[in-house]
C-alpha cells in the first residue's frame, strides 16, 4: 500500500476549505486523527515539461506546468471545492504533506508541495461500477485539477527546496 499524502486548501473567500474534511462525520470510519482539516489524497499526478527542438533536443522556451491533479473521496470539502470552481475563486494556498515510513516504523512527514495563487480548473466525479466485485472496495471519488502561479517543493527530511513562479523571468523565486 502506498504511503499517504494529505492536502489542506485555503480559498480567498471561503477560508480553510478543508476544515473538518477528514473527520468521522465527513468520511466515516476512514478518518485519521491529526489530519481533521486535510483531505486524504488517493492518487496524485503532475507533469512539468520543457519544450525542446526535436532535432537538437535543446530547450525552446520556459517550462510548461500542466494542471496538478489529486484524487480524493467525496467528503465535506467537495461542495466547497465545486463552489470554488464555478465561482473562479482564487486558492491562496494548497499544501500537500507527503509521508513515508520512518526507520522506527512510524509515519513521518518528509516532503511538502505548496501551490500559491492557484485556481481549480476542473473537477471530475468518478464512481467505479458498483456491481463489479473487483471494485467493491472503492467509494465515490473526484479528481481535482489545479493551475497555479507558484509551486514550491520542500524536502523536509533532507532540507532541500525548489520553486517556480511564472511571474519570475527566470522561473525561480
Give the residues covered by each predicted segment.
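Glycine-rich, low-complexity intrinsically disordered segments
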Residues: 1-173
